Amino acid sequence: MQNQRIRIRLKAFDHRLIDQSTAEIVDTAKRTGAQVHGPIPLPTRKEHFTILISPHVNKDARDQYVIRTHKRLVDIVKPTEKTVDALMRLELAAGVDVQISLG
């Protein structure tokens, strides 16, 4: 495990949830003796939707909505056995999507 790297990508619609989850991951990794690079904020994806609120006429009556997808990246360099075990047992918020890759 000494020469490997764990890359964790987090996605969420709520920036507070993703920041809280990232802090938990960084604290857990540092507590177990691994080096941590990050959290690195990645570009936020914004999706814009415009919806007509009038059923028939009044083309000017519209609502606009935005969905923001926040992303963070955390690299764990030189993870130990304790680091992997602690990350597997870690409970994160339900609104956060986590992708883990070994490299």
Curated annotation (Swiss-Prot):
Q: Name one Pfam family in it.
A: Ribosomal_S10
Give the Gene Ontology MF terms in alphabetical order: structural constituent of ribosome; tRNA binding
Say if the entry is tagged with keyword Manganese: no
Biological process annotations from GO: translation
Q: Tell me the superkingdom of the source.
A: Bacteria
Question: What Gene3D superfamilies would the database entry show?
Answer: Ribosomal protein S10 domain
Q: SMART domains recorded for this chain? A: Ribosomal_S10
Task: Please provide the record's keywords in A-Z order.
Answer: Ribonucleoprotein, Ribosomal protein
Tell me which GO cellular component terms the UniProt record holds. ribonucleoprotein complex; ribosome
The annotated subunit structure for this chain is:
Part of the 30S ribosomal subunit.
Tell me which family the UniProt entry assigns to this protein. Answer: Belongs to the universal ribosomal protein uS10 family.
The record, for NCBIfam families, names:
PRK00596.1, rpsJ_bact
Provide the protein name.
Small ribosomal subunit protein uS10
